Amino acid sequence: GIGTLLMLIGTFYFIARGWGVTDKKAREYYAITILVPGIASAAYLSMFFGIGLTTVEVAGMAEPLEIYYARYADWLFTTPLLLLDLALLANADRTTIGTLIGVDALMIVTGLIGALSHTPLARYTWWLFSTIAFLFVLYYLLTVLRSAAAELSEDVQTTFNTLTALVAVLWTAYPILWIIGTEGAGVVGLGVETLAFMVLDVTA
């Protein structure tokens, strides 16, 4: 419930900020940005009502794992939108944008396959696959997109570098949380994991 509320607040905040904006690029930015918490609020509401939840039997585990696949559905839409925001800010070309979003989708889908796998080996293999895709996304952000942004005004460069640093730090926490959470080694419980993912989602 809290996640839904916070995401709705974020949605209305960006609607208010973007209201009456006439600059074409700024309107584009707000249109994309509004969608991110809007989609996330729908995903969190579905999880609140027990939709988007399944159980997976994993070899060697006494109890089946509860997997919130709605979380992955959320990320499959919201993470490309966040990257699209950064790419448009950097004035990146279509090939760069397509590559970045394609690899990002691969990262999310392989993470979901890992979460739904029935053996520890398969789960960790898919996690590794997803993490490699994430590292590629990170590399693209910090090199290709940063180079594109470097050709623009100082204000744009500063904004881009700040947002990219924030994304890099926050997104790095996701594969770490996956591997130590219930979907991985089980060092932290479902409650802590869910809360941590909510904090990361809201902050990102």
Swiss-Prot record:
Side Extracellular, residues: 51-70, 117-123, 187-192
A single Gene Ontology CC term: plasma membrane
Topology relative to the membrane: Multi-pass membrane protein
Ranges in coiled-coil conformation: none
Main subcellular location of this protein, as a coarse class: membrane
Domain of life: Archaea
Ranges in the topological domain labelled Cytoplasmic: 17-30, 91-96, 144-166
Annotated keywords: Cell membrane, Chromophore, Hydrogen ion transport, Ion transport, Membrane, Photoreceptor protein, Receptor, Retinal protein, Sensory transduction, Transmembrane, Transmembrane helix, Transport
Keyword Transmembrane helix attached: yes
Function: Light-driven proton pump.
Similarity-based family: Belongs to the archaeal/bacterial/fungal opsin family.
Protein's recorded name: Bacteriorhodopsin
Lineage of origin: Archaea, Methanobacteriati, Methanobacteriota, Stenosarchaea group, Halobacteria
